[in-house]
Amino acid sequence: MSIVNISCYKFVTLNDREALKADLGARCLQLGLRGTILLAPEGINVFLAGTRAAIDAIVAGLRADPRFADLEPKLSLSAEAPFTRMRVRLKKEIITMKMPVVRPEEGRAPAVAAATLKRWLDQGCDDEGRPVVMLDTRNDYEVAAGSFENAVDYGIGVFSEFPPQLQRRRDDYAGKTVVSFCTGGIRCEKAAIHMQEIGVERVYQLEGGILKYFEEVGGAHYRGGCFVFDAREAVGADLQPLGGRVHC
């Protein structure tokens, strides 16, 4: 497999989006990359595929900007590029929640690392003895490809449906530790901040999402694959395309 696929995001205030769009678009085309970069006032969201050299070059270029110096892309390999073209797009949000009061660039919710989460799930509680609730913030068609064992999901069709569903179920999480998760971390970060704001007592986001969990600890306590928004459709715990091997 010769194609490297990366995804990463950063919540950070961007006031020069037009200039960034032109610059990143030109660099990606020059490097022969395919994929999508989203730019919004709240930050950047990146999905790219290309040769190892091209990916290394664009990541180095992004990190040269102090705003993106701590970007930590999640990597996987494939035989072919899962994208057909290169696009840099300007958006109102890098992930649409329609909750303007939620401003992740002003501060993150607490995060739990993959190894720590695995330990909690192994022992059936967090380190303080609280029950752990895995809360899937993804859309219903993504959940159908796979999810954590016994995870709660709201059967939503789009992420903007998450806040009202959460509001109705807020009291279900009293006395429990809630871990929000998604594909790569962006939605669970927004979701965790929103949960804190409406008074859910103990909330963590899964650092780096499902893909980082797969990368660091494999598929423990997870069933099926992880839906991805490209031609691969879903990847397994080994981060390889599942094709027809998805089991729900």
UniProtKB/Swiss-Prot annotation:
GO terms for biological process: tRNA modification. It comes from the Bacteria. It catalyses: uridine(34) in tRNA + AH2 + O2 = 5-hydroxyuridine(34) in tRNA + A + H2O. Its EC number is 1.14.-.-. Residues 128-222 form the Rhodanese domain. It is an enzyme of class 1 (oxidoreductase). Coiled coil: none annotated. The keyword Oxidoreductase applies. Keywords: Oxidoreductase, tRNA processing. One of its GO terms (molecular function) is oxidoreductase activity, acting on paired donors, with incorporation or reduction of molecular oxygen. The active site is at residue 182. The keyword Oxidoreductase applies. Pfam families: Rhodanese, UPF0176_N. NCBIfam families: PRK05320.1. Catalyzes oxygen-dependent 5-hydroxyuridine (ho5U) modification at position 34 in tRNAs. Belongs to the TrhO family. HAMAP family: TrhO. This is tRNA uridine(34) hydroxylase. The gene is trhO.
